[in-house]
Amino acid sequence: HEMGHQFDAEHTFNSDNGGCSGNRSSNTAYEPGSGSTIMSYAGLCSPNSYAGYASGRFYHVKSFEQIVTYTTAGSGNSCPTITPTGNQPPIVDAGAGGFSIPISTPFTLPGSATEADGDSLIYSWEQYDLGNAGDWDSPSGDAPIFRVFPPVGEPTRTFPQISDVVN
């Protein structure tokens, strides 16, 4: 977490309760409640915390964007030695355009990717919406409501989790 700050990554949680009070970064608050990634305050924003969950060992895509900007265009780019890896980025297809669904309707997002070097791929589906600070259990339609999970090998994700839908 503190290393992320050294690379210009800000907090990504959206709660302003408990230990999160006064620490929310409104321009990077993409995670509901206390958040669940490295730059979150997982478990510290009572009552909006993920119970028993420590910060994941992965960054939210917004943190990744900030770190890449710092190391390629910011002051973190003042003295690098660039070493080409030869690795090709994957070609990703998460669908074109958008779609509408009725409110409170579970949905599944499919995706696919190919990688020219034959590397195995993992997938992370992340909500990328900023909004007002607030509680995840009383959504107002203008803030993130879906938490980030660690990347997996399956190229689909159901929102909310299927276990939450059937319970």
Regions found by a protein language model. Name each.
Residues E2-N167:
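Extracellular (secreted or membrane-anchored) zinc-dependent metallopeptidases
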